[in-house]
Amino acid sequence: MISEVDVRASLNEIIDPCSTAAGCSAGLDEMGLVRAVEVRETASGTDIRVVIGVTEYGCLMGAPFANEAYKRLQALPGAAIITVELDGKFDWDRDDMRADYQERLKRHRIVRGLLRIPVVVTPLASPSAPKVSADLSR
């Protein structure tokens, strides 16, 4: 029997490239792009219907997301009829992201902010020049 948790876990393996470009990769479920999941047991197996969204109207990832979602869901043991739809509302908001991903993204942005401290590097520094280091463990 395939559960909604199984479906969401499978879809979360599909990484949103914009999250990767931002330096903090997230799957579709973490990003809040899995808009709906329906799982129904039938005599022939589990029918699965999902609705996938994108973050904005101009996003070109809708079709690739849907194609990859179909492949991954079809590969689940016991999957029968798979229906993948694209959400045409384009109403995604940052609040749609899962809370655990929002926290991870927040920590990433804090670290990224610390890494933007300007550092002057002298390529031909003498051995007696002071060494500069930063403690980023805080």
Give, region by region, the residue ranges found by the protein language model.
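Domain-level signature for proteins that mediate thiol-based redox and metal-cofactor handling
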Residues: 1-138
